[in-house]
């Protein structure tokens, strides 16, 4: 079996979406009574499909996402045999401080075929040197993943998620709206809060307003701020929690290690915005901040 790996195109969106949707055993939605009910895929709205796993849950949102990738946001690859797509990989180049450095992060590796998986990984490894990346990384949730059984993985960082109270504090800071989405701004910056995959991938997902055409997403209160506190700059992304408007999901990019002053500024600003709880994912070595 000869497997070809190539850059994905818009024409591939249907097949890629099918790979992701095949992993969803039951399609559901919340009815007007607030109860979860099983529904056929075809009867769900684009947004209801989105809630099951993001952009690749439908061709419509997948095409929007693919267009963003092809314009330079990331690297989309497909593995095919005789023009039939068996696998998809999506990766992002990110330039961050140590221990990450300049890396190529795998955001998605979707295939049910081991040979296709290996072919996609080999194609990404071949891109490391031309892209001047020192390592290929992938995130896992919980304990060992299937990749631990197949490949030699070296842990770099462990992420912990915390609920932090938003509260007013005696801190002098400046917070202004910042809508510039040029990724060059965070080149070499750390992402001490909200880094689930890589700084670049999170930026392309959160800072770019590519999903405003979905009214349900547009209605969620979202803020992008440039914060200056005690001589340190930070870029803050804050989004209302899906089911609790008094909770917020937070992501922060900084040119230097995270400081107590920046955290205090974020908590104070969030409290003034009406939030009472901040959901923050941080490296376990930095949680004392």
What are these regions (language model features)?
Residues 80, 92-97, 103-117, 247-260:
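A short, internal acetyl-CoA/4′-phosphopantetheine-binding micro-motif in the GNAT/acyltransferase core
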Residues 2-5:
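Extreme N-terminal starter segment of soluble prokaryotic enzymes
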Residues 128-141, 272-283:
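Conserved GNAT acetyl-CoA-binding A-motif
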Residues 77, 87-89, 104, 109, ...:
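Conserved GNAT-family N-acetyltransferase fold
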Residues 111-128, 150, 256-271:
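Conserved acetyl-CoA-binding loop-helix of GNAT-fold acetyltransferases
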Residues 242-289:
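Extended, charged low-complexity segments
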Residues 142-158, 284-289:
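Conserved active-site alpha-helix within GNAT-family acetyltransferase domains
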Residues 14-20, 24-83, 151-244:
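Amide-forming acyltransferase catalytic core, primarily the GNAT-like/NAT-type
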